[in-house]
């Protein structure tokens, strides 16, 4: 029985570690751009446990379905477009670096999946945030209609990419 649980537990633990790597990438980039962060959490919902290190609260939450870094949104919005892109891409960069370093291992593959998955322009994901920063920079202002068009077309494009990837893996 325990032998059957070990691979499942390994994937769960390595996925959690890859999510932490992702958020640490955002944290390092935010620190580099002087954007304050108040919380790094693994999971969502009520807090199970946590600790404070410096100004940041590190929390484990009850629903382990993701992770997040709580940044000062006002401070981030005041940064230049390249700085905002660096903060939004920080997690992806860390995941891809770890994927290369851990090439051929389950941890490497999980980091690759999380990094590439976050590049997709789904609403509120890193790829979407980068697209909005680039669009605002090109338009030189916020445009609600343009952001809605980008959001819907980004989600549609992401679904096409995911469908193509699943189809490709099915053919292999």
Give, region by region, the residue ranges found by the protein language model.
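Hydrophobic transmembrane alpha-helices and their immediate loop junctions
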Residues: 1-172
